[in-house]
Design a protein with these regions (language model features):
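Short, surface-exposed beta-strand/turn modules with glycine/proline-rich turns
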Residues: 1-32
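Short, surface-exposed polybasic-aromatic patches that bind anionic ligands, especially phosphate groups
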Residues: 41
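Short, structured protein-protein interaction patches enriched in aromatics and acidic/basic residues
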Residues: 49-73
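Helix-rich interaction surfaces within compact, conserved domain-sized segments
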Residues: 77-89, 99
């Protein structure tokens, strides 16, 4: 990442734990990116398009709240991002605004907040319905991994890849 002093505004997607993502215009400078994620930044490139994820590089070590999962092309959980992160566009070594298409794609991808549970050696992903209530089964239906609320209450857990 270059930090050549430019302070041009870029349009990014902000993804906070337990919240739906939102679009925000921020400075592309290092200090601005650090302020958004709450610390030292790390950039990763988990997608096939010209975009990047900026996250707090020390988020897990600092015990920041788990936020969203990163999944492989087959839908298996690969990693969990801790703390607030940004999705932004890339142009060579510089960061830039997301396109309208990218905004729509990543808004949909990260629309449903997630909680995570570690049980029996497996990380489980629990979608959080609108309003953040994970206690009741209302409005939850089936999770992406196939577990219903009734299954979870009965102790029938599912891993992120859908295996019981």
């Amino acid at each position: 990442m270059k930090d050549n002093g430019k302070k041009a505004g870029i349009t990014v997607l902000v993804v906070e734990p337990l919240k739906e993502p939102y679009v925000k215009t921020i400075s592309s400078g290092l200090k601005s990116l650090q302020a958004e994620v709450g610390g030292n930044i790390e950039e990763i490139f988990p997608f096939d398009d010209a975009s990047a994820v900026i996250l707090n590089g020390d988020g897990k070590l600092k015990g920041l709240m788990p936020n969203r999962g990163l999944y492989d092309c087959e839908g298996r959980l690969c990693d969990v991002i801790a703390g607030t992160f940004l999705v932004l566009g890339t142009a060579g070594e510089d960061f830039c605004s997301l396109s309208k298409e990218q905004i729509a794609e990543y808004m949909e991808r990260y629309k449903v907040p997630e909680r995570f549970s570690y049980r029996n050696g497996a990380v489980r992903v629990i979608p959080v319905p609108a309003g953040g209530n994970t206690k009741t089964g209302k409005h939850m239906g089936k999770s992406p991994a196939g577990a219903t609320t009734q299954d979870r209450k009965a102790g029938k857990g599912y891993r992120a890849d859908g295996v019981r």
